[in-house]
Every structure is written in structure tokens, then in C-alpha cells.
């Protein structure tokens, strides 16, 4: 009994601590709408330079319990300045007024929200101040209460959705001289790269670069293993441009390995199937020419994007894959989804083999920070989806099979490389 009395204050203290346990969600993990670049977002300072009262700040996370949810906001305001803010969780909104204290942060509590159904929730912060009266610099959103227990949020400054990949197994001993894949974008947020034909030395696909520009990208890595600066790559390790198509830009790339980059600005259409082909032609025991071809929907013919001579090769295509990437991060809350279908490989002697099996993988962000990443089969094609904060996920390494089409790409009237630019 004496022991229990001795432990009682400790037990009560632990219970009190547990009841006050909080989830601190950094401001740098939030998204901005309608302009994803409408304020400055950084890991060091949170959200600053928020001027436009029409701008909304959004957090997304999974609440695993129903019940009361207490929310507060940590921010900075000039001493004596006031700011009125509205926080909306689901369909419920609360407003609060805060007075600044200069360089010190202040906490603005909102009335409790009721979470009726567990699952992903959107937290929308709005300024109710008139134009010209900034709402303050936002540091964090704080959650407490029964509904916050075991909540899952991305707490890292990286706001990108997880990158997702299809890995295609090839029969053992098969030399792959060509890799063909069809790709249909179903969603088209800015800063999306849907990559159709990847292999051990490069990748080929299409990007959404701005509201007015889209590109077809074909890139080939150098040898030597340099991670960032192509200026450090010795001449014998550099890939060399052999040819490029009409209107194609060709140059260097770095910071994700180094190599030769090429792109064609072209307004490919969401919802329409695009066709991609990569070929490998060994020229001697140590060099292979890799070429990327695109079936141009307007010209109704195959066009060359570019060809690169890669050193320390001499073989064919290996490690075939496709991927979808959110390369911007500022709109990582939006869903990206595309269909990948009718994959074929061609051997050096001209035999076509259909690839109907693929396995799923994702980058480190998909391990724990962002679980909204998926692969499956839809309308007879593989699909990749990531972002959107939708429930569920696909396990790493899961294998899928699609129905065979039996339709090999036999219409390959490819342009003569010697006639290319």
C-alpha cells in the first residue's frame, strides 16, 4: 500500500503528460493554394512573406481516432499587431484572434473540433485580415486531444509525394536491343515526370514543366559515378551526342548523377496514349549508342529525340523500369496517376517479347513519410499513382500481371540517324 501511495503522484503525472501529448506539424510541410509559390516556405523559418489574404495554407494527415481534436497555431507577429485566422478541419471551421509579441512566438488556440470519422483530414488555414495586413509568419500547427493519438503526418521539409516505380523482369539471358512502352497520363499537376522507358543508363518520358510548357525528356548517364558536377567527369567517361531530332535541345545534366540531357518542347495531351521506344546498338566492346524515339501524334510518325554514345558499355538494355515523379514538391498534395501499358522488348535478331509482369517500388519518402503510393492494373494496363492523401497503399515489392495484348509495335519506321541533326 505504501508503495502504491509512493507511485501515485508519478502515475498521475504520467497520465497528465499523456493527456497533453501533442503532435507538432511544422509549417514547412504545408502546401499553398491557389498559388503554390504564393509565400516563402522553408525548414528554417516556416511560412513567411504571406501577403495575399486569398492564399490558403493546407496540411494533410491521417487521424486514426475519432473524438475531440484541439488545434493551435504557433506564429510570429510584430508586437501589438493583430491577426484574425480561420482554421477548417473537414466541414468544421473555427476562428481566432491573436496579438503579436515581436520576435517571440505566440500560440493561437482554436475551439475544439469533433472528428467523426478517422482517416485523412485536410487542415485549411485562412487569413481574415484585410489586404495589406499580413497574417503573420507561421511556425507550426499543434494537435492535441483523443483524435490526435497515433496521428500520421509527414513531418519532414520534403513535401514531394513519394516517387513510384514499375520494375520489369526480363527472361534470363535475353539481350534487349529495344524497349517499347505506351504511357497515358490521367492527372497532370505541374512538376510531374511520367517516365515510360528506363534502363540502367537512362530514362525517357514526359514532363509538365509549367502551365504553358510540356516536354519529352531523354537522358543518358555518364560513366564514372560522379553525383553532381559534370565538369568533374573525365572525357573518357562522358556520353557523347551522336544525333538529335528537329527542334530538340541537347546539353548536360547534373545533381542526380551526370550525363547528356535532351528534350523536345511539345504539348502532349493528358488522357491520350503516348508511345516511346529506346534502342541500344553496341558499336564495339566498350561503347553502345542509346537512342530515344517518340511517335509524334501530329506528324503520325516516329521522330528521334536524341542518340548518345555511352562509354564503358558494349552491351544492351538492362534493368528496365518506368516511374512517376513529383519533381517540384510545392504541390505534392495533388494526385499524380498514369497508365503504363503494352510493354515489349526486341532482341538483336528482331524477335518481339511482351512484358506482362511488373513489381512495385518507391523511394525513401514512401517508407514512412508519405504512404499514399500505389500500383495496380486498370483497363488492362499497369498504373502508378502517388499523392492525393488517399487511404491505403501498395506494399513495396508487390508483383502484378496485366493481360497480354499480343500487339507488338511492328510499325517502327524509324528515322535514319545519319540524316538527323
Predicted regions: what they are:
Residues 1-4:
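Positively charged n-region of N-terminal signal peptides that target proteins for export
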Residues 16-18:
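N-terminal signal peptide c-region/cleavage motif recognized by signal peptidases
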Residues 21-267, 279-282, 286-421:
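Extracytoplasmic
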Residues 272-276:
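Short Pro-Gly-centered flexible turn/kink motifs
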Residues 6-14:
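Bacterial N-terminal signal peptides
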Amino acid at each position: 500500500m505504501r508503495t502504491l501511495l509512493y507511485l501515485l503522484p508519478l502515475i498521475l503525472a504520467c497520465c497528465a503528460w499523456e493527456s497533453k501529448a501533442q503532435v507538432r506539424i511544422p509549417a514547412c510541410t504545408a502546401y499553398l493554394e491557389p498559388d503554390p509559390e504564393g509565400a516563402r516556405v522553408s525548414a528554417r523559418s516556416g511560412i513567411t512573406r504571406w501577403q495575399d489574404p486569398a492564399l490558403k495554407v493546407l496540411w494533410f494527415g491521417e487521424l486514426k481516432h475519432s473524438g475531440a481534436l484541439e488545434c493551435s497555431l504557433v506564429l510570429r507577429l510584430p508586437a501589438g499587431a493583430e491577426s484574425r485566422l480561420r482554421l477548417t478541419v473537414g466541414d468544421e471551421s473555427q476562428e481566432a484572434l491573436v496579438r503579436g509579441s515581436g520576435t517571440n512566438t505566440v500560440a493561437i488556440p482554436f475551439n475544439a473540433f469533433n472528428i467523426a470519422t478517422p482517416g485523412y483530414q485536410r487542415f485549411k488555414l485562412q487569413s481574415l485580415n484585410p489586404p495589406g495586413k499580413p497574417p503573420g509568419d507561421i511556425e507550426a500547427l499543434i494537435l492535441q486531444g483523443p483524435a490526435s493519438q497515433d496521428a500520421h503526418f509527414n513531418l519532414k521539409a520534403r513535401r514531394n509525394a513519394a516517387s513510384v516505380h514499375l520494375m520489369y523482369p526480363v527472361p534470363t539471358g535475353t539481350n534487349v536491343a529495344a524497349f517499347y512502352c505506351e504511357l497515358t497520363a490521367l492527372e497532370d499537376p505541374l512538376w510531374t515526370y511520367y517516365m515510360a522507358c528506363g534502363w540502367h543508363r537512362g530514362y525517357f518520358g514526359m514532363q509538365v514543366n509549367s502551365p504553358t510548357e510540356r516536354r519529352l525528356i531523354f537522358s543518358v548517364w555518364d560513366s564514372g559515378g560522379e553525383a553532381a558536377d559534370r565538369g568533374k567527369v573525365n572525357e573518357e567517361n562522358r556520353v557523347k551526342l551522336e544525333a538529335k531530332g528537329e527542334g530538340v535541345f541537347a546539353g548536360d545534366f547534373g545533381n542526380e548523377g551526370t550525363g547528356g540531357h535532351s528534350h523536345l518542347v511539345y504539348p502532349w495531351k493528358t488522357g491520350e496514349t503516348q508511345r516511346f521506344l529506346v534502342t541500344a546498338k553496341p558499336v564495339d566492346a566498350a561503347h553502345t549508342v542509346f537512342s530515344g524515339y517518340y511517335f509524334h501524334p501530329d506528324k503520325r510518325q516516329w521522330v528521334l529525340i536524341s542518340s548518345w554514345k555511352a562509354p564503358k558499355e558494349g552491351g544492351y538494355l538492362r534493368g528496365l523500369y518506368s516511374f512517376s515523379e513529383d519533381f517540384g514538391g510545392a504541390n505534392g498534395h495533388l494526385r499524380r496517376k498514369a497508365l503504363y501499358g503494352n510493354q515489349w522488348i526486341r532482341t538483336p535478331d528482331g524477335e518481339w517479347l511482351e512484358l506482362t509482369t511488373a513489381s512495385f517500388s518507391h523511394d525513401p519518402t514512401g517508407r514512412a513519410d508519405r504512404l499514399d503510393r500505389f500500383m495496380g492494373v486498370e483497363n488492362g494496363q499497369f498504373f502508378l499513382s502517388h499523392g492525393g492523401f488517399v487511404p491505403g497503399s501498395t506494399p513495396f515489392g508487390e508483383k502484378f500481371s496485366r493481360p497480354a495484348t499480343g500487339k507488338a509495335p511492328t510499325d517502327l519506321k524509324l528515322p535514319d540517324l545519319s540524316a538527323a541533326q
